[in-house]
Structures are given as C-alpha cells and as structure tokens.
Design a protein with these regions (language model features):
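Conserved phosphate- and dinucleotide-binding cores of soluble alpha/beta proteins
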Residues: 3-10, 17-19, 32, 38, ...
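Structural signal for interior beta-strand "rungs" in well-ordered beta-sheet cores
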Residues: 88-89, 105, 118, 220
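Short glycine/serine/threonine-rich phosphate/pyrophosphate-binding segments
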Residues: 96-99, 205-206
Length: 244
C-alpha cells in the first residue's frame, strides 16, 4: 500500500493465503485506526497532512518507478504512432511522461498536455508546438485540473489522445482511486482517436471513480503479460488491443 497507494481485497487474500472475509475484517480494523479508508473491493492509504483529498493517487515519482520496463515498451509503441504534422493530447501520468520523452527529437507536431513534467521536457524541443492546459495544479501528480483546464480543451481538434490508468476492465473502462478526476473526459471530444497506455498490472484493478467508459477508448497498448481472459473480454468490445 505504501508503494501503490491502494490495495484490493482479492490481491491481499492471495498474498496472505487468507479468506476475503478475513482481509475485509483486517481492513476494517485499520480504518478504525485511521490508517486506511475503505472503498468497494479494497482500501486506500490515508495521506496525512494533505487537505486535497484523503485517498490520493500514487505520486508521480512512485508511478514512474513502477513497472518501468513494460512502460518503456508501451511508450515506444505509442511514439511510433505519432507522425509529423499531427496534433497529440497527453494526459498526465508516468507512461505518458515516457511518451513525452520519446518525442524529444520529433519535428513539426503539436502537443497539448495538462502534465507539468511533460510540458517541461517538451519545452526543450523548439520543433514542437506546445500547448499547456491552464487550471489548478494537483501537486501529487504535478498536473493541471479543474474547470479552467477543461475549458482550455474546447475547440481543440487533435489526432490522438494518450491516457494512462489506475485500473481498467472491459466493463467499466478506465477507473481511478482519485476523486474529482474529470479532465480526461474533457480531452476525449477533442481527439479523433483515444489510446490507453498501461501495463498489464492495471487490468481488473477497479477504482471507485470512472475516468472513461470502455466505449470511449479506441486502442489499448499494454505489455505481453496481459492474461488471455482479459484479451477475450476486450474482443467483445470495439477496442483494439496492442501488446508489446
């Protein structure tokens, strides 16, 4: 939990060889002690001293370190989809940050992002037209959010949008453990194609807030460790799955 910020009951039951009922009882005890807050199917670490929200998403540095090898392959595959003359939207996140790094030598493209680290990196490339969403800074993820950020996406016509995920499944689409995350939904109408970039560990992790329904996603790029069950589930949707 310290590393990922959240845990799922079914994962803990497998790790500790205990029943889900026992795990739920333990999480209930920890909630009473003020260590975690529970949600349906799991729990999140309470971040003391942070007024933004009690149940926070994993910080940017922690995200960047997790599953780094698969994320690099995923980012490289995403970069290959971006061609000269394109306009691209990058949502905030560790995998989309790797995409930004992969665009450091790109020429004649436009990148729109709410990610401060991505914007800082891309600002070094004078051959990129960089558009940064305004709004309120969410310090944990170093990204821009709120109504100002969402309004800045109006009248944008991008070729591709890249979005990460805390969790994804074929029924609920992309979900998050963070409250009030709505900017991804504002990005979708501005893009002709929506591409989710996430490592296979994110499959069947379900946050309590939906970011994007599965119907809004055109392509998922993930690593080759994704299960056959998840592949079959996605075959029943309109989503194209790319494994790397």
């Amino acid at each position: 939990m310290n590393e990922q910020g959240t845990v799922l009951v079914q994962d803990l039951a497998g790790v500790f060889a205990a029943s889900e009922a026992t795990i739920r009882a333990d999480l209930r005890f920890l909630e009473q002690k003020g260590v975690v807050t529970r949600f349906h199917g799991g729990a999140a670490k309470i971040m003391s001293g942070n007024s933004e929200t009690e149940t926070q998403e994993v910080g940017f540095k922690e995200r960047f370190q997790l599953a780094s090898a698969p994320k690099n392959r995923i980012a490289q595959a995403a970069v290959k989809m971006i061609h000269e003359g394109m306009t691209v939207i990058l949502d905030s996140g560790s995998t989309t940050m790797l995409i930004a790094e992969g665009l450091m030598t790109a020429k004649n493209i436009t990148v729109i992002t709410n990610s401060l680290p991505a914007a800082f990196a891309l600002s070094e490339n004078k051959d990129i037209t960089l558009v940064v969403c305004g709004g309120t800074v969410r310090h944990k993820t170093r990204s821009m959010h709120g109504s100002i950020a969402e309004r800045s996406l109006q009248d944008i016509n991008a070729d591709l949008m890249f979005v990460g995920a805390d969790g994804i499944d074929a029924v609920n689409g992309i979900t998050t453990f963070n409250e009030g995350y709505s900017i991804s939904g504002a990005m979708v109408p501005a893009a002709n194609k929506v591409i989710a970039v996430l490592d296979s560990s994110k499959f069947n992790r379900r946050g309590f807030n939906q970011v994007l329904p599965i119907e809004k996603i055109d392509i998922i790029i993930t690593d080759d460790a994704v299960s056959e069950v998840d592949k079959l589930a996605l075959q029943k949707t309109r989503v194209k799955l790319i494994t790397v």
